[in-house]
């Protein structure tokens, strides 16, 4: 790639005063933490909070610990956008869009309607028609947000606290879809390109599914395991109301079983007891599921962009929220994640990989063999590492070895997928890149960063099914993946890359792909990086706020 075309140069020139190739810089000349607009805001806010709420107990003090600002406190460019922000604005606690990304995933549950309809028709002799389905959908939209049905004298939830809660329906049956109230329909034909729509409808068949969006506030106050229970309770009550059933009817137990267990698709699997987490929590969300949650394949034909948007969503969800908070209990994982979705660095490496593949093999132009994995991963890894050698500013941007290891390996895996359409080959490209990188620099990042990479290739081809699961079926709790930051979001992007190369309508689940195409969602899953930028710039309007029940100010 010609030097002037390198995608990361614009960001480097904006971030640093020196030429990106300059080998020398200054220290302790930037004004310490006061060089940062956000740090100055934090200090001012701290003084106000101390005066009004802390009873003299200290809070924020940037002069404690390692002195901030001896180096440039650099801004970040959100990759694929023209937006710049400070690093603090990408911490999930400071970014409403990243919070909403997780809220919108956690508060979702997909429920099959056919079992309940079968109970109505076969056990109770009640006819199910498009008209009765529409009536039920009207009822569930009242109940799901906290409205009372069946019983009187019941307390209800203020609509302003639950405006983001609703239920919609989708089906692969065009005739039925045409008769349903369009307000409740997730219309596959309108939301997806024609070829994708046909593939999705074929996968779904004549079945009908409800997508429940529980209020964001419920997930925050309770947990992901609450979501299906909240949904199931309101589904049962809404069936009783819409179909005028007796609440004590024995068949209602079947509604309960279907909506809580038999016909429920959670976003995340329940985790082992030692993780202390139920379903619909980040550690149980498989990489293929996250690939289908992200919707870039609907709006862009660029396979690299499709893959990188999944990487960004995964970096925020898995690295920042799951590993950075749930698992470690700290605040320090943000910049592991941002390395993968800022400053167009991974973009540059990945487009180099695609260019190399298209010239040598053609997209989807070769079989998945170790020779192909070795060729592409070696080429892309060496290109990536050479950029760090040539541009010291790039090295300063990715100041941690594990940041560099993650993006070089991710681009290698994406490149292998572009050539083969095979996610297992792609993840082996990642593993090879890590090993090459370690040979190049003697180490990668913190001790143990490369634990999974040393055994990954043999695991991916193992006989034991817990180790050899296809990449799409793996997740944060897969053996050896549990506590190594700077991997999981990239794995999800590699899984997507294989399906992007193939032109598939979905990676793992047609149901998830359709459910998250819903334009009523608060977070736009077709452009996660743009949404993160809006959150960083404080332009994102999130759900789940409590202003209506707080004192007026």
From Swiss-Prot:
Transmembrane portions of the chain: none
Co-factor remark: Binds 2 coenzyme F430 non-covalently per MCR complex. Coenzyme F430 is a yellow nickel porphinoid. Methyl-coenzyme-M reductase is activated when the enzyme-bound coenzyme F430 is reduced to the Ni(I) oxidation state.
InterPro entries reported in the protein's UniProt record: Me_CoM_Rdtase_asu, Me_CoM_Rdtase_asu/bsu_C, Me_CoM_Rdtase_asu_C, Me_CoM_Rdtase_asu_N, Me_CoM_Rdtase_asu_N_sub1, Me_CoM_Rdtase_asu_N_sub2, Me_CoM_Rdtase_Fd-like_fold
Cystine connections: none
GO cellular component: cytoplasm
Localization, UniProt: Cytoplasm
A single GO BP: methanogenesis
Binding-site residues for coenzyme M, renumbered to this chain: 336, 447
SUPFAM superfamilies linked: Methyl-coenzyme M reductase alpha and beta chain C-terminal domain (SSF48081), Methyl-coenzyme M reductase subunits (SSF55088)
EC number: 2.8.4.1
Known catalytic reactions: coenzyme B + methyl-coenzyme M = methane + coenzyme M-coenzyme B heterodisulfide
Cofactor: coenzyme F430
Binding-site list for coenzyme F430: 151
Pathway: One-carbon metabolism; methyl-coenzyme M reduction; methane from methyl-coenzyme M: step 1/1
Residues reported in the UniProt entry to bind coenzyme B: 229, 260-261, 274
GO MF annotation list: coenzyme-B sulfoethylthiotransferase activity; metal ion binding
Keywords assigned: Cytoplasm, Metal-binding, Methanogenesis, Methylation, Nickel, Transferase
Function: Component of the methyl-coenzyme M reductase (MCR) I that catalyzes the reductive cleavage of methyl-coenzyme M (CoM-S-CH3 or 2-(methylthio)ethanesulfonate) using coenzyme B (CoB or 7-mercaptoheptanoylthreonine phosphate) as reductant which results in the production of methane and the mixed heterodisulfide of CoB and CoM (CoM-S-S-CoB). This is the final step in methanogenesis.
Oligomeric form and interacting partners: MCR is a hexamer of two alpha, two beta, and two gamma chains, forming a dimer of heterotrimers.
Family classification: Belongs to the methyl-coenzyme M reductase alpha subunit family.
Descriptive protein name: Methyl-coenzyme M reductase subunit alpha
Organism of origin: Methanococcus vannielii
